[in-house]
């Protein structure tokens, strides 16, 4: 089975410009492809998994990845899938975020001469002459066609700034530049990027008279159609300082039964034959499949040692054991207490378990907070310095665990 056929079997491909040519190129290891990452945060998220694992699979098959950091396009902001305008970042913020991305990508793909490259489109976009760009590139784009693009439709009623309207042209120029200077013949991206990607292939055809190709990756969604990568409205980060390895493990361990086999097929590197066999598992073995999913992904992001720790801690908690050594922990300071005490809502806030006091009240009223096996029934509950020194094991809902110490 060639790599293209494997991508199809794993359900990773959404749309392609020319299936036969793309199949031939990537199966023969002749593709130099790029995927763009707008560095709007200082960490990648679980939502980037599809792109990262695709780059790894294709590199293993002999193809050359280019991870393109959007140092220039991030200054504009991609309107795709947005109903509002993205926050604009400083050049320093973007450079810092790019460095963080590189560190995380190192776990997935191998960088170096003749291997993967990381480039920053600020290196060519920030030096463009506006008049020259309009004459050489702008003339190749139809405004009528651009306005029909899916990436702009959601913004038309609320208002689409001219700044954002240029995003498609900038992304297309990236592909054109990479084709000329790096031999990049293929662009991969999320399914919501299709219009932008077609703009790049068309620009190359019109300016250079050559063929380039585009392929979109299936968006990672659950059985309800919701994008994966967030929990309770918060991103699931790949940075262990933002989402601990334990919380990362638990996120995947707690996916719906209906989703687990799809995610194993799409995201892990387990052989397809093994996955087909797992697909016949039922009842209690579904939980075993969830643990395998969580372990494989945590190992990929945080390493085998952290994955083992997270699995051990999760098993202990599930079995009602006392091993909380690998549980996410917050160490409180004396100044966070008042007269040697802290109220339960302040405790939950300090541990990052609630965003607002009203959320905390609602959780308490619904019986969703358990501390040291005691279900909290009132917000007047307080804890002392001695309680914290002994350690407080907090459970939020059924699946979120945290420890508070002092």
Language-model features: locations:
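NTP-dependent nucleotidyl-transfer catalytic core
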Residues: 1-193, 198-201, 207-213, 226, ...
